[in-house]
């Protein structure tokens, strides 16, 4: 039955608490709103009341409001977002630099929680839990079987600092289970994955995100590398999706002399704000720098690479970055949820806007990688063309380009082996993981006796033909077979190196992984060669 509006129950026109809250959120100062804005807010409130009181079935008003907010933000730009109360802490965690829990890195192996490594100095490490231990009970309840997944494990092992969780561990060589009562604590979440000497005099730092702890980690990395004789630095920001603006400014400051513009932000409701370098940089007076970027380097990564490029401070090597130059400001909502709303755009010192266009909609925006690949941009610099209006000049007279993202000074085509169907299936079906876990389950102790340090492992360990044959058998069991006519061929030698690198990560840490696998990294080797050829480096800098 359809009721004429005039005959709807009076309760439909009573302002519910939910609508009142929503209206207040959208218009904290209603007098400052235009008539059009006030009418839009009232329209939404009325629509929600009608749905709430007249819809054929019961409705969940908070869910409806959340859905409406999500759609509104989606219509604005690709990066404004709604975050539920339950997800706020999880989303912020990587940038906070820590979380609270027991302090273990784990993987699921044969429906069992396998400790890959305890966090050094963390609560599990202090109690004596070691790599290779299998957690079979949590708080007296079996933690083995098909019900076990990553979410299940994290829900039970993470928790507030000071709370206790009991685990029972099966250890190789021990008949009985070992019980541990672990008092949860703050666990550091590092943003630097690797720090080592890539070549004599050349340091390498891989930064994965711009978090609250990144600068402390960076200073420690620089100190370590200088002790090992570092003069020049390769800063790896590939696939670094960004983080805090202040951290990006502070990192840029490390390389620039005082009073240089690093970045500025500006929006309709936000006046231009300039961010300048200070005189406190640890790398501002000496030492050359190369920044590695790729199509997944975004936001804060683009601020750093853009500032270094615009001031002719170093070289940028790789492929055009993602092109995320929108500033999101968090707004807390009364129920604990959050809006991350775009309030401004980033601009590099020369005035380039980092943000790529998004007028064609969110779906097309996130197809950018596919479009770049199809247009040839990822494999050939000749396929990239910029109109004169997007050209900018640096102080040294070099031409740099706007239009979205940072175009590198030295272009390196994407490694086509990453598109190998065989390699993709090996990863997707978990063949690498299964092989590494089963191999270490049998051989961990023997390897560590023979190679007590990573340096010894790197120099002496070889993935022999028996190991590789076992790996291929594991692949065949998962129905992963290399096609005879494979378009993109992933060499056997590279697969063996990947196995060695993954073993290193499980036996030591992420840094060990990168130090092994980077032996076949074309972008890194190009950066090393440029730093070793001072004449070529200076020429590319315009000096």
Predicted regions and their residues:
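Structural motif
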Residues: 132-134
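Conserved functional hotspot residues or short segments at active or partner-binding sites
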Residues: 353-354, 358-543
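Bacterial N-terminal signal peptides that target proteins for export
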Residues: 2-17
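Bacterial N-terminal signal peptides
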Residues: 16-27
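Cleft-lining beta-strand/loop regions that shape enzyme active-site pockets
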Residues: 2, 28-40, 44-61, 84, ...
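Extended, small/polar residue-biased N-terminal targeting/export presequences
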Residues: 55-116, 162-194, 517-528, 536-543
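Polar, glycine-rich mid-to-C-terminal structural blocks
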Residues: 300, 312, 319, 323-390
């Amino acid at each position: 039955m359809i009721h004429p509006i005039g005959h709807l129950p009076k309760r439909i026109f009573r302002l519910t608490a939910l609508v009142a809250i929503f209206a207040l959120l959208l218009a904290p100062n209603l007098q400052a709103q235009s008539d059009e804005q006030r009418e839009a807010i009232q329209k939404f409130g009325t629509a929600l009341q009608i749905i709430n009181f007249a819809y054929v079935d019961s409705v969940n008003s908070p869910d409806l409001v959340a859905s409406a907010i999500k759609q509104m933000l989606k219509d604005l730009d690709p990066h404004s977002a709604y975050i539920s109360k339950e997800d706020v802490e999880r989303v912020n965690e990587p940038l906070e630099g820590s979380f609270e829990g027991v302090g273990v890195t784990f993987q699921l192996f044969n429906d069992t929680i396998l400790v890959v490594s305890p966090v050094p100095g963390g609560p599990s490490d202090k109690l004596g839990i070691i790599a290779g231990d299998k957690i079979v009970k949590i708080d007296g309840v079996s933690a083995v079987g098909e019900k076990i997944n990553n979410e299940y494990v994290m829900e039970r092992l993470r928790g507030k600092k000071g709370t206790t969780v009991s685990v029972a561990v099966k250890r190789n060589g021990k008949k009985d289970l070992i019980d541990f009562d672990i008092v949860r604590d703050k666990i550091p979440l590092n943003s630097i994955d690797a720090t080592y000497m890539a070549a004599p005099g050349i340091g390498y730092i891989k930064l994965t995100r711009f978090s609250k702890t990144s600068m402390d980690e960076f200073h420690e990395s620089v100190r370590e590398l200088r002790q090992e004789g570092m003069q020049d630095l390769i800063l790896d920001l590939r696939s670094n999706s960004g983080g805090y603006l202040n951290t990006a400014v502070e990192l840029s400051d490390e390389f620039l002399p005082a009073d240089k513009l690093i970045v500025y932000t500006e929006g309709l409701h936000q006046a231009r704000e300039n961010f300048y370098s200070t005189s406190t940089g640890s790398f501002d007076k000496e030492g050359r720098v190369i920044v590695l970027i790729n199509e997944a380097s975004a936001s804060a990564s683009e601020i750093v690479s853009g500032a270094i490029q615009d001031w002719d401070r170093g070289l940028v090597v790789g492929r055009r970055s993602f092109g995320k130059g929108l500033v999101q400001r968090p707004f807390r909502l009364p129920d604990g949820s959050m809006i991350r709303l775009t309030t401004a755009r980033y601009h590099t010192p020369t005035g380039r806007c980092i943000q790529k266009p998004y007028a064609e909609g969110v779906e097309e925006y996130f197809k950018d990688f596919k479009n770049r690949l199809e247009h040839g941009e990822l494999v050939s610099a000749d396929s990239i063309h910029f109109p004169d209006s997007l050209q900018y000049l640096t102080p040294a007279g070099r031409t740099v380009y706007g239009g979205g993202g940072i175009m590198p000074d030295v272009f390196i085509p994407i490694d086509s082996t990453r598109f190998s169907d065989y390699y993709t299936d090996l990863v997707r079906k978990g063949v690498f993981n299964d092989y590494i876990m089963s191999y270490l389950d049998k051989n961990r102790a023997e390897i560590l006796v023979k190679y007590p340090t990573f340096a010894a492992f790197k120099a002496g360990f070889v993935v022999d033909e028996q190991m590789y044959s076992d790996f291929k058998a594991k692949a065949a069991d998962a129905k992963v077979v290399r096609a005879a006519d494979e378009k993109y061929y992933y060499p056997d030698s590279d697969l063996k190196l990947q196995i060695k690198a993954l073993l290193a990560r499980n036996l030591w840490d992420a840094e060990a992984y990168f130090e092994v696998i980077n032996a076949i990294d074309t972008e890194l080797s190009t950066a090393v060669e440029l730093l070793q050829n001072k004449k070529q480096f200076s020429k590319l800098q315009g000096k």
